[in-house]
């Protein structure tokens, strides 16, 4: 077997990058020739975590079939979120914590999906199940992933298992989860140097909801006005993306990590679905969603329901 490439979704976040690294490390310990790679540029939060725990940025790839015949997916399963030539390779494994959609394989595979807040929480179990000790820096990366996905344990996606795993990993890494976590989240929330096109692609995922093609992008900030003061440009870029990608709906979610509220900006012919999904009224294509921070648990399910049929 050729080298196995391990990667998460396009527009990678901290869980996608850190879990690819951590799982590749486990697989190598178990005798597999594995390499973590990425499908896009890393964000400021992820960069902070990698530097803190002495990890190299995984290699960027646009295709995989040109160098391997086997891959492992972490932190995603939906085809449109994965590498473009996924159908040309064999998917050996999937380790994920999201809904299963638009995914099928020609061969049997190992599929581990759990309703937890982060892929790294599952990896913590896999290390234990395989009797492999987690190295200090790898533990730090896995902790970073959990902090990121759970917004420092405040997200409704966060489970007791995530909190328990984070405590274990923080002890191994030798850091205080709360103080380190806040520093890491703040590093990711500094959006001042980012252009609007960059903000729309930092953490964007495409979904099929009923017969609709939907993209949801999310950024975290300590002040939503950092983004919304550029609303005119946001509207223009959203409309451009809708046209170029053939989207029915593009939802841009700006999340305040201090108040745990989000502001959404909607564009596309199906924009009214946002009103139905969240029982809000769009004013200038914009609405505030109180207490909403999780795309996976609080945005995707009601929007999917609103776009049925």
Swiss-Prot record:
Cofactor note: Binds 2 manganese ions per subunit.
Keyword Amino-acid biosynthesis: no
Residues involved in Mn(2+) 1 binding: 9, 13, 75
Pfam families per UniProt: DHH, DHHA2
GO CC annotation terms, alphabetical: cytoplasm
Cofactor: Mn(2+)
MF terms in GO: inorganic diphosphate phosphatase activity; manganese ion binding
Subcellular location: Cytoplasm
EC number: 3.6.1.1
Enzyme class, first EC level, given as a word: hydrolase
Binding positions for Mn(2+) 2 per the UniProt entry: 15, 75, 97, 149
Keywords: Cytoplasm, Hydrolase, Manganese, Metal-binding
Disulfide bonds: none
Main subcellular location of this protein, as a coarse class: cytoplasm
SUPFAM superfamilies assigned: DHH phosphoesterases
Reactions performed catalytically: diphosphate + H2O = 2 phosphate + H(+)
PANTHER family: BNIP - RELATED, MANGANESE-DEPENDENT INORGANIC PYROPHOSPHATASE-RELATED
Similarity-based family: Belongs to the PPase class C family.
NCBIfam families, per the entry: PRK05427.1
Protein name: Probable manganese-dependent inorganic pyrophosphatase
Protein source organism: Bacillus licheniformis (strain ATCC 14580 / DSM 13 / JCM 2505 / CCUG 7422 / NBRC 12200 / NCIMB 9375 / NCTC 10341 / NRRL NRS-1264 / Gibson 46)
